[in-house]
Amino acid sequence: MVEIIGERVGEVVGSPQLQQIVLVEIPTAGGSRERVRAEFSAVVAGGAGQALRPGDAVIVVKSPPPDQTYFVADRDRSRPLAFIAAVFVALAVLLGRLRGVTSLVGLGITVVVLAEFVVPGILSGASPLLVSVLGALVIAVASIYLAHGFSRRTSIAVASTLITLTLSAFLAAAAVSVARLFGSGTEEAFYLQLGLLKQVNLRGLLLGGIILGAVGVLDDITTGQAAAVDEIHKANPALPVRELYQRGRSVGTEHITSLVNTLFLAYAGASLPLFILFTINTYQPLWVTLSSEFVAEEIVRTLVGSIALILAVPITTQMAAYVLGRGVGQVRP
């Protein structure tokens, strides 16, 4: 954006709205740059500086004929996002070294699985739940082995993740069915039912989202729990399986209390505006708000993920105690 030609603050549905006429510079087909007038509007919220300033990178859209006017759709945030991503990659490599590199490769595989398998599979009319579960299994296996290497305790974490993920799929299906959720609680779900995408199974899509969301937290707790039991076993190889399990459970209890709270805060942070609306809503009782499709979906998502975390601890601990305590899979001289 080059210059502000004019601006004013109007009112739309009782809310102040900023309206600006600005001069922007856009590239042309011949490689040169052209200056055009464009309109920009934004709701003035919380005193935030949403007004455009000279030097801002913006996304300009041209309306179709016969008007062919220009308007600013949004700010171009590609450069700051690329910078933040570069900092993330640099820190992962600098602090994680080889494991940091392999974890980034695992992240890349996750993106590829989602973009090339899960999304196309859902768009082709396949069951969103089945596609998401298969994608989650591939993501779990690839990301855990790449991030933590090939070892007995990593294989224990992978097996525990797959078992817990399968149980979570059944649990999510039961919870969605009992709560009578249909996956239509968000604006995005509404748009998916329009046009060519109306064949998408929204309930299956909701279930698939719950499963994919559980993979990341399961990865964390199963690898950490398997590592804890392994270290206890190395410190005292003479411990019987039962004692190894009990000591591992003691560590797992700490994992549960911290990660359940972490999972809740992750959802709460993403839905902070919704929490604020709860506090100022005086038109209907709280139980009515909680029963709405959108809120109930988030509650089920959080609770299923938390239950998956809780189940992962005894499953991983029992498997690790048995395999490590009895020397299953150990190469003997």
Feature annotation, model-predicted:
Residues 1-18:
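Structural detector for short beta-strands of small beta-barrel domains
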Residues 27-29, 63:
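Short, surface-exposed secondary-structure boundary micro-motifs
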Residues 43-79:
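Extended, hydrophilic extramembrane loops/domains of integral membrane proteins
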Residues 87-193, 200-213:
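Transmembrane alpha-helical segments that form the functional core of multipass membrane systems
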Residues 149-159, 178-190, 224-236, 287, ...:
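Juxtamembrane helix-loop transition segments at the membrane interface in multi-pass membrane proteins
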Residues 160-164, 195-212, 258, 262, ...:
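Pore-lining and gate-forming transmembrane alpha-helices of multi-pass membrane transport proteins
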Residues 215-223, 229-278, 282-283:
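Helical hairpin unit composed of two closely spaced alpha helices linked by a short loop
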Residues 268, 272-333:
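Hydrophobic alpha-helical transmembrane segments of membrane transport and translocation systems
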